[in-house]
């Protein structure tokens, strides 16, 4: 738009300056021109003109030129773009390849102004849980007082422990695979180990916000117990507790009822500190039937081991840490559970502090966190749990496709490092040939040293790589603590230098605001397009920070969806969204914008040539109605239709060759070089439109209105044929739009010239019946299209880009399919 404004100023300045020169050369003759004549024609007095001098007239001419040539600024383009985006959004929503069969949810387009950005994405920032994984947690193993219990049996429907309530058998709705040794220990065991095991599963049954719901079945004597809650992790842990004989059957704001192997026990809820991303743990204070008060705490190992009293059982702590490493190495999500028995004095002190903090008007959240920190200390380690969260269908293939498309995928997760690395290998984010750069620091100094070492490694590997084939792939793995030190000490530039040199970045144990900080790190320092995708409330800040935000409609509510630009059901839908629709949208929108520049510039240059041959008076032979209708009726509809329906490549080709996505990243369809080319093309075509009829009719008696009608028709036909030459896939709608607009132009010109009160009455009829008129139209089209046709042919045959090569392959494949139909049955190679 800035370039078009410059062209407008140049055109207006040229006309104004030439007008000033003309006025100076004809100063003595201005009296005979009605426009300047102040008095009647009986007295021709030199200098007595109705104007304020040459300077003022030049300024007036410049401003009039702005009004005359303002069509070059495509104001209507913004309306066309919104219509096109709405059409593109419709086809994205209706795409069955992005329909989630499990949730029966279609793709949602919540923002209509960034469709084309989907074709230029360079970085994808993804959450892990619920985004790459199903967020359907299954309890797999437990570490109890330093002993590993991970030998689960088949655990089917019949293995679910049932409880009897008022004569009705109630079974948990979900079964859990159990370890028979752990079950036996809980049922019949004695001693410290059995006590710790029972406390652990009591903690799992009580330290949560789960609500038990009893559902009816076909059998009146049997019912199902469903656990509902915000966190799938909590649901899995409560189902596990039920499978091991500790069934949560009732919860109110004041008490919890747990069935312990057939014995119902009531526990008073004396206090609850809910989970938050800063503490990374939650705790509950319960009053037990034996009148003791216990504090149960569960949370991430990075948070829990700081409050565990390691002097009580150092061997147990060491064994548990070993088990946690083993669990996370196979991709399990881990939690650590602790307990402490509170004295009455400790409880009363906590109760007073809690009541004061909870009723505070200012800083309530910080005060409650402080109260929690004071009570959550000197905990006795009970053990740990391992929960499996399976990958979503098609995630490894999707990440591989994105990598082939030149898109860098960064995973930002709250899981511990070993779990994140294991999932990274499972989803093909990490590969065995990658060199891993691990930054896992517990102090500012060690973090600084790790960053410096990482930069040295990157520079060394760069010097050893002579070409792209010999380049060693790099993966950066960094934890949340290191990010805290980096962001606090303004070492972001070094982190950026390391991160962009890596093919993969894996951030673990990161808080929600750190996720947004990572996205902002790239946005501030590059012009690359970023995309963030997540499913939970902790992903909202990241989604809002990225250029394009995508929400997964999953198990953790709709906060991410509500904050996003687009929403879908599965991570794998990102491939057709970006590689197919993103490519189409960018290609079509880029072409539409340049085409609008071209068609308006062609029309304006015709007006400009006319002004140069009419004494710079800024009159026009083209009627005002045609000037207005040019961008509204004559040429608008074909542009919009092509921008919605045209496809440069098929879906199959775009998915088979992800590298074609790079055209959008390199801005091949919208750049300064193409703008200059279309401006040169518009100048040439305007010369053909103006001068061929002008030279043919200059010695005839034809009036300017008839010539203006010829110019109008010639411009409209020329720009529509130009568009038709660039259409790749024709539909009946495309045919109707392009050829229909030409017919509509003819009808409008005839109707306008048939109204006696309008200028140019009957003008079209004066020339339309002559053979010269039709010959000139043909000549204008042929001469005007020669450069465009030649440039198109030369580019496609001698300088083809990847898109054109793929298009030729499609044509060859289509012709081969026609002669050999059996080829259509072969499997498409998507590797």
PLM feature spans:
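Hydrophobic, membrane-inserted alpha-helices
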Residues: 606-610, 715-722
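Helix-coil boundary and interhelical linker segments in multi-pass alpha-helical membrane proteins
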Residues: 614-621, 694-702
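Alpha-helical transmembrane segments and their membrane-interface junctions
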Residues: 684-697
């Amino acid at each position: 738009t800035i370039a078009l404004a410059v062209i407008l100023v140049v055109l207006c300045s040229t006309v104004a300056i030439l007008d000033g020169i003309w006025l100076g050369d004809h100063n003595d003759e201005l009296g005979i021109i009605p426009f300047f004549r102040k008095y009647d024609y009986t007295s021709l007095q030199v200098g007595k003109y109705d104007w304020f001098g040459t300077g003022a007239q030049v300024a007036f001419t410049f401003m009039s030129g702005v009004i005359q040539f303002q069509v070059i600024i495509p104001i209507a383009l913004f309306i066309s773009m919104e219509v096109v985006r709405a059409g593109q959004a419709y086809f994205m929503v209706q795409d069955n390849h992005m329909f989630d069969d499990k949730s029966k949810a279609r793709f949602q387009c919540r923002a209509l102004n960034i469709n084309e950005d989907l074709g230029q994405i360079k970085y994808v920032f993804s959450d892990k849980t619920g985004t790459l994984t199903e967020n359907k947690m299954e309890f797999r193993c437990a570490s109890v007082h330093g002993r590993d219990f991970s030998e689960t049996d088949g655990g089917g429907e019949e293995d679910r422990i049932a409880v009897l309530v008022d004569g009705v058998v109630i079974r948990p709705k979900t079964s859990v695979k159990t370890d028979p040794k752990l079950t036996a220990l809980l049922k019949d065991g004695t001693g410290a180990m059995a006590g710790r095991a029972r406390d652990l599963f009591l903690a799992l049954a009580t330290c949560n916000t789960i609500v038990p719901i009893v559902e009816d079945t076909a059998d009146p004597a049997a019912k199902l117990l469903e656990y509902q809650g915000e966190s799938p992790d909590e649901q899995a842990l409560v189902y596990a507790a039920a499978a091991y004989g500790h069934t949560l059957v009732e919860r109110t704001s004041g008490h919890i009822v747990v069935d312990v192997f057939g014995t119902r026990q009531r526990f008073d809820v004396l206090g609850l500190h809910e989970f938050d991303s800063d503490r990374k743990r939650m705790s509950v204070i319960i009053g037990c039937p034996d009148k003791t008060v216990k504090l149960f705490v569960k949370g991430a190992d990075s948070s829990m081991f700081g409050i565990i009293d390691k002097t009580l059982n150092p061997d147990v702590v060491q064994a548990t840490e070993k088990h946690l490493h083993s669990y996370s190495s196979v991709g399990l999500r881990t939690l650590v559970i602790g307990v402490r028995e509170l004295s009455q004095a400790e409880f009363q002190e906590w109760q007073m502090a809690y009541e004061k903090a909870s009723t505070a008007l200012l800083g309530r959240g910080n005060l409650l966190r402080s109260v929690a920190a004071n009570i959550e200390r000197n905990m006795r380690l009970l053990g740990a749990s391992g929960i499996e969260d399976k990958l979503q269908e098609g995630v490894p293939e999707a990440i591989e496709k994105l990598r082939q498309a030149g898109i860098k995928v960064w995973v930002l997760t709250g899981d511990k490092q070993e779990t994140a690395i294991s999932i990274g290998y499972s989803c093909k984010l990490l590969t065995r040939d990658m060199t891993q750069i691990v930054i896992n620091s517990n102090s500012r100094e060690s973090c600084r040293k790790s960053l410096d070492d990482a930069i040295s490694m990157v520079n060394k590997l760069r010097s050893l790589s002579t070409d792209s084939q010999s380049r060693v792939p790099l993966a950066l793995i960094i934890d949340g603590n290191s990010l805290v030190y980096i962001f606090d000490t303004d070492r972001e530039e070094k982190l950026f230098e390391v991160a962009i040199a890596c093919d993969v970045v894996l951030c673990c144990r990161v808080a929600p605001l750190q996720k947004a900080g990572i996205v902002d790190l790239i946005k501030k320092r590059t012009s690359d397009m970023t995309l963030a995708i997540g499913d939970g409330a902790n992903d909202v800040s990241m989604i809002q920070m990225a250029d394009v935000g995508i929400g997964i409609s999953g198990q953790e509510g709709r906060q991410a969806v509500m904050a996003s630009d687009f929403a879908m059901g599965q991570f794998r839908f990102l491939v057709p969204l970006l590689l197919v629709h993103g490519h189409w949208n960018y290609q079509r929108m880029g072409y539409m914008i340049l085409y609008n520049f071209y068609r308006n510039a062609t029309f304006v240059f015709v007006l400009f040539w006319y002004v140069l041959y009419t004494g710079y008076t800024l009159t026009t032979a083209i009627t005002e109605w045609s000037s207005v209708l040019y961008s509204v009726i004559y040429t608008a509809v074909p542009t919009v239709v092509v921008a919605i329906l045209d496809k440069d490549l098929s879906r199959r080709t775009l998915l088979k060759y992800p590298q074609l996505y790079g055209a959008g990243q390199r801005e091949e369809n919208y750049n300064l070089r193409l703008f200059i080319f279309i401006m040169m093309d518009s100048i040439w075509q305007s010369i053909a439109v103006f001068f061929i009829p002008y030279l043919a009719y200059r010695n005839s008696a034809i009036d300017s209105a008839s010539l203006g009608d010829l110019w109008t028709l010639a411009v409209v036909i020329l720009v529509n044929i130009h568009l038709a030459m660039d259409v790749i896939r024709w539909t009946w709608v495309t045919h109707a739009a392009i050829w229909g607009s030409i017919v509509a132009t003819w009808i409008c010109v005839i109707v306008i010239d048939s109204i006696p009160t309008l200028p140019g009455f009957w003008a079209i009829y004066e020339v339309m019946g002559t053979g010269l008129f039709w010959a000139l139209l043909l000549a204008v089209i042929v001469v005007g299209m020669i450069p465009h046709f030649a440039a198109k042919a030369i580019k496609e045959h001698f300088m083809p880009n990847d898109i054109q090569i793929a298009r030729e392959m499609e044509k060859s494949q289509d012709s081969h399919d026609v002669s050999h139909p059996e080829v259509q049955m072969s499997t498409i190679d998507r590797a």
